[in-house]
Structure formats: structure tokens, C-alpha cells
Amino acid sequence: MLLQGTHRIGRMAMLLALADENESPVLSIPKGWKYCTGKVGSMNSQKVVAAMETAAKSNQVIETDVYRETHALYHAIMEALYGVTRGQIQLADVLRTVGLRFAIVRGTPYDGKKEGEWVAVALYGTIGAPVK
């Protein structure tokens, strides 16, 4: 049940989100793990969530026909957005926009098989007034 030292899923997601396109992450992805990265910018939080969900589905990080996987990913994305927006996910209503790089990682960070697979979402970028 202990977290494996080389299998820190949140850290892996952050490294992937921080890496440029031409960089590879410092750590290699553990065998059997899935991930995707991308960029999203919008004044609409629904578009941010939709772009990240679409990336995860098109890169086979989650299965498109399994509701539980989509639901788990949605909650992980919302938690990450809460962090970036400091608890207020409103963007357009308060004239804020985001430009973000994201990483979504799915894997088994724990030794025990009973713990199952986990998903981590990391966001990195800017939040501020829209540029006109």
C-alpha cells in the first residue's frame, strides 16, 4: 500500500506539464502508464475542461465509453483548475483568461493492486486579463 518512490504520479504530471515540446521529462514514464500533454487557452472554463477531456480520450488515457473514467478525470481537472484560479473557477464573468499547458497521467502509483489506477492532472501557465 506504500507509494512507490519512482511512481509519484502527481510529480510525473507536473514534470510533463512544465516540459517544453522539445524536452523530455527528467524521469521516464513507468511501464503501463498512459499520459497526454497539450495546451489550452480560453476565457471559458467549460472549454478548458472540454479540451483536456478530448485530449485524454483521443490519446487513449481514458476509455471513451466508460463513464467512471470520464467522471474521475473531470474531478481531477476541476481540482487542478481550483488551484490555478485560487478557488474561483469563474473566468469570463470576472474578465479573466487562462493560457495553460496541461498533462494528464494515468497509472498505478501504489504497490497494492487493490489501490487500482489513479489519474493526475497538472496545469502550468498564466491567468489574467484578456488581451484585446
Swiss-Prot record:
UniProt-listed GO biological process terms: L-histidine metabolic process
GO-annotated molecular function: RNA binding
The keyword Aminoacyl-tRNA synthetase appears for this protein: no
UniProt keyword terms in alphabetical order: Activator, Histidine metabolism, RNA-binding, Transcription, Transcription regulation
InterPro entries tied to this protein: Regulatory_HutP, Regulatory_HutP_sf
Protein family according to the UniProt entry: Belongs to the HutP family.
Oligomer status and interactors: Homohexamer.
NCBIfam families: PRK03065.1 (NF002838)
Its job: Antiterminator that binds to cis-acting regulatory sequences on the mRNA in the presence of histidine, thereby suppressing transcription termination and activating the hut operon for histidine utilization.
Protein name per its UniProtKB record: Hut operon positive regulatory protein
Organism from which the protein derives: Bacillus cereus
Lineage, opening ranks: Bacteria, Bacillati, Bacillota, Bacilli, Bacillales
Record gene name: hutP
